[in-house]
Amino acid sequence: MKDEHNQEHDHLSQKEPEFCEKACACKEQQNEEMQEASEKECEIKEDFELKYKEMHEKYLRVHADFENVKKRLERDKSMALEYAYEKIALDLLPVIDALLGAYKSAAEVDKESALTKGLELTMEKLHEVLARHGIEGIECLEEFDPNFHNAIMQVKSEEKENGKIVQVLQQGYKYKGRVLRPAMVSIAKND
């Protein structure tokens, strides 16, 4: 029995180096496979990060484009409203002129009549509404300003110096600071 045991032990001892070689080869193969898997994982990770970065940059560009379009639409909408208000204001100017003419005619006949008072009140209310919407009359003080006044004629005037406004022939209006219609005036010429 001892002999059998020794033979078996010798047989195992002979197989041990062979087993070690196989185990080492297997371990090396596992290490190589692990290294390949790790390299593949790194490549996948790098590829994912690159695609993520590209997608993020595309998102930022699309978002910026969207914001620019949104701003442009808001600006266009605002400009369209401004244009509409300006157009309405221009269309109202002849009505205002007619109302002012009626008031002046009525005031010449009877300044205290109900008609004159009604026209005056209507003019005041109309100017209040127009002012609320940025439409206001151009002031025609002493100085002539070609940006706001249009000189229709020159008249001799002993009371005014050359180039000063003598009379307003037609009221001018501006919308939010921009001239809708210049005031038509006569200016003094004393040569």
Curated annotation (Swiss-Prot):
Keyword terms: Chaperone, Cytoplasm, Stress response
Subcellular location: Cytoplasm
Gene Ontology molecular function terms on file: adenyl-nucleotide exchange factor activity; protein homodimerization activity; protein-folding chaperone binding; unfolded protein binding
Gene3D superfamilies for the chain: 3.90.20.20, Head domain of nucleotide exchange factor GrpE (2.30.22.10)
Superkingdom of the source species: Bacteria
Predominant cellular place of this UniProt entry's protein: cytoplasm
Subunit structure: Homodimer.
Protein's UniProt name: Protein GrpE
Provenance organism: Helicobacter pylori (strain P12)
Gene name for this UniProt entry: grpE
